[in-house]
């Protein structure tokens, strides 16, 4: 990894290089980073790891190096240092935690997205599609096109049509131009009421009319003279106003025509799916020619509108018609759905479950069929519940897939204002009258009493009720009209497809026609192989539904008595269990809706012969529906009086709780609440919301069926109890448990769980299958990506990989070494000892170990090979090895974690703010930060720079800076051996065998890669190339893009020069003092010897040349005089030569310091420095010459 962000900082100092110029050079290669890249990054097109990716990567890169005739030395990593192990462990732990959090977040987002999509799909409802139904065995998925598939050629017809359109457009424009010219010439010449104008396209008409409007608004007075009489001016204004009004009307009509033209396709599309009663109005919202927005309000299907407006219809059938049964229903469904899928299912006939799914998907077309049938009442569309919505219902219900013979149709309908739900038992009617009844023994029956509900006038008699739960006053009443508002369906809210109209079950008030009984039978088709046998019942079995009217404290009540007599059908006396529902039991509770699945007792939904009876409830008819009304007078006496028929009487389901929900009774259904209905399924021919379940009954003798009757002023809820007499020999578990039967409830829950698991895929629609497949595909893709990411993170370089790589290097004849510790440190020491010409690596740690030449991006196909030198880095950025180590402290590396939120720019600013050598800048920074944290609550120092104000917010560790990090970089454990390396020639045969065993390559493929490399190696080059004689073109150094970084580098380099100048100046001052003391000693020695020679006066420091002489006035004078012929020099040699060198250097440094104060520092200052020259050779020569010149000076 290296130092974070260091390559970004050093990129300005790198320059591109041609790999061909590296021929013959010895380069060290850090193979450890190759192995990590191969293990973590090498993937195939599907994202899976490639087998032996490390060997394949090494093979190709070796071929590239040998092709350029480069002599590589590979270096393997040894044992990781302690600091590196600690840092990598912490980093890996932090990365894993972040990865886990990211995966959890992605899962939450995915679940949220899927829930939203499911809700949207549920709200959108079913839409008719003209596409063929896909096969259930394989749902087609959109495949990616082949890269090499060419686009189809354009047809000549398309070209001709485009030319025709262009021609028509030109004609329109010419016509428009002519009309405009005529109008401008004479405004009255354009007649907007003419047929010629009306035949124009709406776009042209709109432009002409708008031009006319603008023209008449501005230039009317040019063509119409003002009235001379002031009294006629009002007429003039009124005339213009009328013309303007006509023009505006015409413009509005044209705009409507344009809107109709734009929205015609949308309107046609929706009309084909049912149509809209309201118009689609479009308006332009933005100034874009290609954009058009359509706002559709009040969407309502024409079928639904017709159903809402249609009056209640009487349910009357001729007795000669064949009644509908629950038997052979799926066979009828198969016949019904065959025309819909002949094109897609000719090869193999679909299974019954497939027919169910297809029938659910074509719900819209079935609604259309119901609309055309006269016997369907006005509110058939109540069941327009989307399959996705019903799927949510299925999750709380269970379905027995095997071994169950009785399937009961249940429809879930709830109220708009109430949220609780309830399961309901449905008896519906339809138009299929061709089905016959199949009993358990296989016999068939014709039109019989079990399917006919007859109402005779003689049955409308008063009867006495002796039940304890009934009120005292009882009167007989026919089933007249049951009406209930629709409920708000779950998951749909305001956008549900269920219409808001009230559902009605109408019995004609006229009961004189006894020969036309009412046939109420479910005719939802099912397959013949799933036949529903009728249930043998007891002769005395009776179901009574009591409907009290709670409008007052002592109000009237009604009850519906369902009696069943099985004597005429020849049934056995097997009992039927009871359904129990408590008033406070929650509706649609999955845990309470189960009964034992092992019992064979099922309830027949066929109420045979609904008839109002007088005294006896069992007289010749199998099943009778009695409607009686009981009231209790204030006196408490029991009075019987006949109830007059009221066609507006309403009966609804509910409980005696005022907050209970409404359960509607549809024209095709008599709905009875039942908590034991489970495993429902959407399957309908005339109602889309039918749910098919298996119902079994418990051992309880009482059935609580909840009704609700709305009063005149407010809605009230009452409790009803249906008493069913019969044998209680069944072992089913009742839904209403006592406190002493906890085990029965647990058994019920366990059996339901088993049913949920076994029948999860029992019935599913086409849309659900497609959605499920898409969701699974997305989930699979996500899991694959997650698995690949986890494998990439967990992948590590093993020792076996290193051994295999070394084996391949031996086959190619390439030398390699195993470093004691870090491979980068070993490569750096090879560079420092001139054993290599550089290192091929992408790890920036190598600079901290002292490398001088680095080649980066050598094997990157999208980038040039970059060459970096330590000298360029030092000259352009002012960074040396110690500063690079300090950057590692701040940015983070394999040895230290760094400071959070500190990048390479901020790190350079820190080094600029705190200059120094070694770790001194970091120590100063830590001390300043500690003081700043102590005074954090106080006002900040106004003298602090902007950088320091930002640095106050950083968080430093207590151990910062750790000296062990710098020691690890400055003194790494390396092999300092300087033994020579040797290279061999590749063994072709061994390499072929290696590639065949590891890569599975054939001999031909190996030769295609390897033979060009061997040919290049064998090429003998005796003549030198021209680039060996001429220096290559110099690459211009890239500038620093960041202004902050540029400022920090400039200031840091200036500070370094100032520090160096101060050090040199201090050294020069010390040297000058030593020189002065030495001169004084020499002068004293000369006087003591009695010489008369007089020394020239020393000039002061101010008299010297501002450029800085070498050692004073004597040397300055001698440099301006000619030398004597004998070449003798002055006695300057009496001064030590080292002193002369130091003073000459001090003079040069003084000139540089003076120049630096005038000019601004830049990165090029180091190149303009004056080369220091030693003055010693200038004064070497014979002593006689020097003495002669001195005597000449004295005489003068």
From Swiss-Prot:
<keyword id="KW-0255">Endonuclease</keyword>
<feature type="binding site">
    <location>
        <position position="843"/>
    </location>
    <ligand>
        <name>Mg(2+) 2</name>
    </ligand>
</feature>
<feature type="binding site">
    <location>
        <position position="30"/>
    </location>
    <ligand>
        <name>Mg(2+) 1</name>
    </ligand>
</feature>
<dbReference type="InterPro" id="IPR019974">
    <property type="entry name" value="XPG_CS"/>
</dbReference>
<dbReference type="InterPro" id="IPR036279">
    <property type="entry name" value="5-3_exonuclease_C_sf"/>
</dbReference>
<dbReference type="GO" id="GO:0005634">
    <property type="term" value="C:nucleus"/>
</dbReference>
<feature type="region of interest" description="DNA-binding; may bind to the undamaged single-strand DNA of the DNA repair bubble">
    <location>
        <begin position="31"/>
        <end position="67"/>
    </location>
</feature>
<dbReference type="InterPro" id="IPR001044">
    <property type="entry name" value="XPG/Rad2_eukaryotes"/>
</dbReference>
<feature type="region of interest" description="Disordered">
    <location>
        <begin position="152"/>
        <end position="176"/>
    </location>
</feature>
<comment type="similarity">
    <text>Belongs to the XPG/RAD2 endonuclease family. XPG subfamily.</text>
</comment>
<dbReference type="InterPro" id="IPR006085">
    <property type="entry name" value="XPG_DNA_repair_N"/>
</dbReference>
<keyword id="KW-0460">Magnesium</keyword>
<keyword id="KW-0539">Nucleus</keyword>
<dbReference type="Pfam" id="PF00867">
    <property type="entry name" value="XPG_I"/>
</dbReference>
<feature type="binding site">
    <location>
        <position position="824"/>
    </location>
    <ligand>
        <name>Mg(2+) 1</name>
    </ligand>
</feature>
<dbReference type="GO" id="GO:0046872">
    <property type="term" value="F:metal ion binding"/>
</dbReference>
<comment type="function">
    <text>Single-stranded structure-specific DNA endonuclease involved in DNA excision repair. Makes the 3'incision in DNA nucleotide excision repair (NER). Binds and bends DNA repair bubble substrate and breaks base stacking at the single-strand/double-strand DNA junction of the DNA bubble. Plays a role in base excision repair (BER) by promoting the binding of DNA glycosylase to its substrate and increasing DNA glycosylase catalytic activity that removes oxidized pyrimidines from DNA.</text>
</comment>
<dbReference type="GO" id="GO:0003697">
    <property type="term" value="F:single-stranded DNA binding"/>
</dbReference>
<feature type="region of interest" description="Spacer region">
    <location>
        <begin position="79"/>
        <end position="818"/>
    </location>
</feature>
<dbReference type="InterPro" id="IPR006086">
    <property type="entry name" value="XPG-I_dom"/>
</dbReference>
<feature type="region of interest" description="Disordered">
    <location>
        <begin position="1075"/>
        <end position="1196"/>
    </location>
</feature>
<feature type="compositionally biased region" description="Polar residues">
    <location>
        <begin position="311"/>
        <end position="321"/>
    </location>
</feature>
<keyword id="KW-0479">Metal-binding</keyword>
<feature type="region of interest" description="I-domain">
    <location>
        <begin position="819"/>
        <end position="914"/>
    </location>
</feature>
<feature type="region of interest" description="Disordered">
    <location>
        <begin position="629"/>
        <end position="661"/>
    </location>
</feature>
<feature type="region of interest" description="N-domain">
    <location>
        <begin position="1"/>
        <end position="78"/>
    </location>
</feature>
<feature type="compositionally biased region" description="Low complexity">
    <location>
        <begin position="1119"/>
        <end position="1130"/>
    </location>
</feature>
<dbReference type="InterPro" id="IPR029060">
    <property type="entry name" value="PIN-like_dom_sf"/>
</dbReference>
<feature type="short sequence motif" description="Nuclear localization signal 2">
    <location>
        <begin position="1179"/>
        <end position="1196"/>
    </location>
</feature>
<keyword id="KW-0238">DNA-binding</keyword>
<keyword id="KW-0540">Nuclease</keyword>
<feature type="region of interest" description="DNA-binding; may bind double-stranded DNA">
    <location>
        <begin position="945"/>
        <end position="951"/>
    </location>
</feature>
<keyword id="KW-0158">Chromosome</keyword>
<feature type="binding site">
    <location>
        <position position="822"/>
    </location>
    <ligand>
        <name>Mg(2+) 1</name>
    </ligand>
</feature>
<dbReference type="InterPro" id="IPR008918">
    <property type="entry name" value="HhH2"/>
</dbReference>
<keyword id="KW-0378">Hydrolase</keyword>
<dbReference type="GO" id="GO:0006289">
    <property type="term" value="P:nucleotide-excision repair"/>
</dbReference>
<feature type="region of interest" description="DNA-binding; may bind to the undamaged single-strand DNA of the DNA repair bubble">
    <location>
        <begin position="853"/>
        <end position="869"/>
    </location>
</feature>
<protein>
    <recommendedName>
        <fullName>DNA excision repair protein ERCC-5 homolog</fullName>
        <ecNumber>3.1.-.-</ecNumber>
    </recommendedName>
</protein>
<feature type="binding site">
    <location>
        <position position="77"/>
    </location>
    <ligand>
        <name>Mg(2+) 1</name>
    </ligand>
</feature>
<feature type="region of interest" description="DNA-binding; H2TH (helix-2turn-helix) motif which binds double-stranded DNA">
    <location>
        <begin position="881"/>
        <end position="913"/>
    </location>
</feature>
<feature type="compositionally biased region" description="Polar residues">
    <location>
        <begin position="1142"/>
        <end position="1158"/>
    </location>
</feature>
């Amino acid at each position: 990894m290296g130092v974070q962000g260091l390559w970004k900082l050093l990129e300005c100092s790198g320059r591109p290089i041609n790999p061909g110029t590296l021929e013959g050079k010895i380069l060290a290669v850090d193979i450890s980073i190759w192995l990590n890249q191969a293990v973590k990054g090498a993937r195939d097109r599907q994202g899976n790891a490639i087998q032996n990716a490390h060997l394949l990567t090494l093979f190709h890169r070796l071929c590239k190096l040998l092709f350029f005739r480069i002599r590589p030395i590979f270096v393997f990593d040894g044992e990781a240092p302690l600091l590196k192990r600690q840092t990598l462990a912490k980093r890996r732990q932090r990365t894993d935690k972040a990865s886990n959090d990211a995966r959890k977040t992605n899962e939450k987002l995915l679940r949220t997205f899927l829930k939203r999509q499911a809700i949207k799909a549920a709200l959108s409802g079913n839409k008719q599609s003209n596409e063929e139904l896909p096969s259930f065995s394989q749902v087609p998925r959109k495949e990616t096109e082949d890269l090499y598939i060419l686009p189809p050629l354009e047809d000549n017809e398309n070209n001709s049509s485009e030319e025709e359109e262009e021609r028509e457009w030109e004609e329109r424009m010419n016509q428009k131009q002519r009309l405009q010219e005529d109008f401008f010439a004479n405004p009255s010449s354009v007649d907007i009421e003419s047929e010629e104008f009306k035949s124009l396209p709406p776009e042209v008409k709109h432009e002409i009319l708008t031009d006319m409007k603008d023209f008449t608004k501005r230039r009317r007075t040019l063509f119409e003279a003002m009235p001379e009489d002031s009294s006629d001016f009002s007429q003039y204004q009124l005339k213009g106003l009328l013309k303007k009004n006509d023009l505006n009307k015409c413009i509005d009509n044209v705009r409507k025509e344009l809107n109709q033209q734009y929205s015609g396709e949308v309107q046609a599309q929706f009309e084909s799916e049912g149509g809209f009663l309201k118009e689609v109005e479009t308006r332009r919202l933005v100034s874009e020619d290609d954009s058009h927005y359509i706002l559709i309000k009040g969407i309502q299907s024409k079928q639904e509108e017709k159903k809402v407006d249609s009056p209640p219809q009487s349910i009357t059938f001729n007795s000669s018609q064949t009644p509908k049964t629950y038997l052979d229903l799926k066979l009828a469904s198969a016949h019904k759905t065959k025309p819909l899928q002949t094109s897609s299912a000719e090869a193999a006939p679909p299974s019954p479950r497939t027919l169910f799914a297809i029938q659910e998907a074509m719900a819209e077309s079935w609604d259309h069929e119901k609309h055309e049938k006269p016997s369907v009442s006005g509110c058939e569309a109540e069941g327009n519940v989307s399959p996705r919505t019903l799927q949510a219902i299925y999750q709380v219900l269970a379905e027995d897939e095997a071994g169950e013979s009785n399937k009961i149709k249940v429809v879930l309908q709830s109220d708009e204002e109430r949220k609780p739900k309830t399961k309901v038992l449905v008896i519906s009617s339809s138009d299929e009258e061709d089905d016959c009844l199949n009993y358990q023994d296989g016999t068939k029956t014709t039109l019989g009493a079990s399917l006919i509900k007859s109402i005779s006038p003689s049955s409308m008699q008063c009867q006495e009720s002796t039940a304890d739960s009934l009120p005292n006053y009882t009167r007989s009443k026919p089933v007249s009209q049951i009406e209930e508002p629709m409920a708000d369906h779950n998951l749909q809210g305001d956008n549900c497809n269920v219409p808001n109209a009230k559902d009605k079950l109408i019995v004609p008030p006229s009961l004189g026609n006894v020969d036309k009984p009412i046939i109420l039978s479910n005719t939802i088709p099912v397959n013949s192989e799933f036949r529903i046998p009728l249930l043998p019942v007891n002769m005395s079995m009776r179901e009574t539904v009591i409907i009290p009217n709670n409008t007052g404290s002592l109000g009237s009540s009604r009850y519906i008595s369902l009696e069943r007599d099985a004597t005429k059908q020849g049934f056995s006396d097997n009992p039927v269990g009871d359904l129990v529902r408590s008033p406070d039991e929650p509706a649609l509770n999955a845990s309470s809706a189960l009964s034992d699945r092992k019992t064979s007792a099922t309830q027949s939904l066929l109420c045979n012969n609904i008839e109002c009876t007088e005294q006896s409830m069992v007289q010749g008819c199998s099943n009778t529906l009695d409607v009686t009304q009981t009231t209790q007078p204030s006196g408490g006496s029991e009075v019987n009086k006949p109830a007059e028929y009221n066609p507006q009487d309403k009966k609804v389901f509910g409980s005696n709780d005022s907050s209970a929900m409404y359960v509607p009774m549809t024209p095709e259904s008599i709905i009875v609440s039942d908590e034991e209905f489970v495993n429902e399924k959407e399957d309908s021919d005339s109602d889309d919301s039918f749910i098919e379940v298996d119902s079994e009954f418990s051992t309880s003798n009482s059935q609580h069926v909840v009704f609700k009757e709305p009063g005149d002023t407010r809605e009230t809820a009452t409790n009803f109890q249906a008493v069913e007499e019969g044998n209680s020999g069944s072992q089913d578990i009742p839904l209403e448990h006592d406190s002493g039967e906890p085990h029965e409830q647990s058994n019920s829950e366990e059996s339901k769980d088993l049913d949920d698991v076994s029948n999860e895929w029992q019935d599913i629609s086409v849309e659900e299958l497609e959605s499920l497949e898409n969701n699974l595909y997305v989930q699979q893709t996500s899991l694959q990506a997650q698995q690949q990411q986890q494998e990439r993170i967990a992948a590590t370089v093993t020792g076996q990989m290193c051994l295999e790589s070394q084996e391949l290097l031996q086959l190619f004849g390439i030398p390699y070494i195993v470093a004691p510790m870090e491979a980068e440190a070993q490569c750096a020491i090879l560079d420092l000892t001139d054993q290599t010409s550089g290192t091929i690596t992408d790890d920036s740690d190598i600079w901290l170990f002292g490398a001088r030449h680095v080649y980066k991006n050598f094997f990157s196909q999208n980038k040039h090979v970059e060459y970096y030198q330590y000298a360029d880095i030092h000259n352009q950025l002012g960074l040396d090895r110690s500063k690079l180590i300090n950057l590692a402290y701040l940015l983070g590396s394999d040895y230290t974690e760094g400071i959070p939120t500190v990048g390479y720019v901020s790190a350079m600013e820190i080094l600029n703010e705190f200059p120094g050598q070694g770790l001194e800048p970091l120590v100063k920074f830590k001390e300043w930060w500690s003081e700043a944290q102590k005074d954090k609550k106080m006002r900040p120092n106004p003298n602090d720079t902007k950088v320091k104000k930002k640095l106050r917010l950083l968080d430093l560790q207590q151990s910062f800076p750790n000296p062990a990090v710098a020691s690890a970089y400055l003194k790494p454990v390396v092999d300092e051996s300087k033994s020579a390396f040797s290279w061999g020639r590749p063994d072709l045969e061994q390499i072929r065998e290696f590639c065949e065993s590891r890569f599975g390559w054939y001999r031909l493929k190996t030769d295609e890669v390897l033979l060009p490399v061997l040919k290049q190696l064998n090429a003998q080059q005796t003549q030198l190339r021209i680039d060996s004689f001429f220096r290559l073109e110099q690459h211009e150094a890239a500038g620093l893009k960041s202004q902050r970084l540029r400022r920090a580098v400039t200031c840091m380099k200036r500070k370094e020069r100032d520090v160096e100048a101060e050090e040199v100046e201090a050294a020069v001052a010390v040297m000058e003092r030593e020189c002065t003391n030495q001169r004084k000693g020499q002068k004293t020695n000369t006087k003591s010897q009695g010489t008369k020679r007089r020394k020239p006066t020393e000039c002061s420091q101010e008299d010297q040349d501002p450029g800085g002489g070498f050692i004073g006035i004597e040397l300055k004078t001698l440099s301006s005089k000619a030398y004597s012929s004998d070449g003798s020099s002055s006695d300057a040699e009496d001064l030590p030569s080292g002193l002369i060198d130091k003073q000459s250097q001090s003079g040069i440094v003084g000139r540089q310091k003076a120049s630096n104060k005038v000019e601004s520092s830049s990165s090029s200052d180091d190149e303009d420095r004056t080369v220091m020259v030693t003055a010693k050779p200038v004064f070497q020569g014979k002593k006689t010459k020097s003495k002669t010149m001195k005597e000449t000076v004295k005489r003068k």
